[in-house]
Amino acid sequence: TTVKTANSGITFANGVIAAGQNLTIDSTGGPVSINSVMGSGTATSLTVNADSTDGGDNADTTETISIGAIGTANEIGAVTLDAADGITFTGDITLADAAGADLDIDGKVFISGNVTIDTDNTTGGGTDDGTINFSSTIDGVTEDPAVADNLVIHAGGAGGGSLTLSGNIGDGVALSSLKINATAGNLAFTVPQIGGGDAVGVTGNVDIGNAASGAITFSGTGTNALDVGGVLTVTGNGGATAFQFTGTNVEIRGDGGIAFVNGSGTDD
C-alpha cells in the first residue's frame, strides 16, 4: 500500500494505522505526521519518506516526520524513515523477531517524551535481532510546558543485530535521560559525543551497557566528549578492552558521579 503526495503534507492525526501489508508513505517534500502504526505480521514493512529528492533539498525546510508508537511484539518488520529536516519520535518502536526487521533512520532525530526503541529479541528467547541505524544527531525537544525527553535503546547483537549512532547526542537540546543497553544485550557498540557548546548532552542520568556488554567505544573529543548532568554509569564485560576512547583531549563529566564497571555474566 502506498500513500503519496507531491510536496504536500500527510497527516494521520488520530487512531492507529493497522498495516496488513507493506506500507509506504511518501510526501515528496511535505511534512508527515503519524499518530501510530501497528501491523499484522513479522514481514510487514513501513517506509516513510518526506524528502523531495534523495538526501533532501537544502532549500526545502518542510521535509519532516513526526511519528508515535510503531509496532509491539511481532507486528512490524523493517522500518525506514527519511526526512532531511528532522524526525521526531513521540512513542515506542518495537520491531519483530524476524530476519531483516531493521530500523533505518535517515535524518536528525528529536526525542519528545518517553521513547523506547527495541530490536533486541534474543534476550527474550527470540532468534533475530534487528539493526538500529541513526544517520545523524539525536536531541531533545524544547516544549512549553516542558516535557522530559527520555530515550531508551535496546539493541541486540545476535542474528545480525547492531547499533550505529552516527551523530552527537544532546548537542542542540539536551535529553532528560539516556539508557543504551542498560539492562540486557551483549553487543559491542560505539557512543558518539554527548553534549556540546560547553553544555551537558543529558541533564539527568546516563546508563550505558550492562554486565554482558561487549567493548564500548567512545568517539567524542574535547570538553564535551562525554558531558552528563546526572550520574554517568558505564558497564561492560569486554575485559582489557571493555572501554575505549578514540577522541583527543577527552574530558568526562558526570555532575552526579561517574562509574565505569567492568562486569561479567550472561545476557541478563
Task: List PLM regions with ranges.
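Extracellular lectin-like interaction modules
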Residues: T1-D268
